[in-house]
């Protein structure tokens, strides 16, 4: 699965997935506004947004890259490109 994932935040608009996270929570960033990062948990019919600091989001994305490299994941290039676009 190499598709991009987007969510609509009720206040900040479109968010895009930056990295899968831990415990069923993924990391998303604002698409149009000043960069804000969210830890997002999706349950049956509810979505929970938690604002997180830039460095926490970057750390989680780096951990995801390391994990993808160890596994030899087919999606490694996708995550590397997203990391560069978002954090560098």
Question: Where are each of the predicted segments found?
Answer:
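Ubiquitous "structural anchor" signal
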Residues: 20-21, 29, 80-81, 87-88
């Amino acid at each position: 699965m190499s598709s991009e994932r987007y969510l609509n935040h009720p206040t900040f608009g479109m968010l895009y997935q930056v990295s899968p996270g831990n415990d069923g929570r993924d990391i998303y960033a604002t698409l149009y506004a000043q960069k804000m990062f969210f830890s997002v948990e999706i349950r049956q019919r509810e979505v929970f947004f938690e604002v997180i600091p830039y460095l926490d989001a970057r750390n989680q994305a780096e951990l995801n890259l390391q994990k993808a490299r160890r596994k030899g994941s087919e999606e490694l290039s996708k995550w590397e490109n997203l990391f560069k676009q978002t954090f560098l």
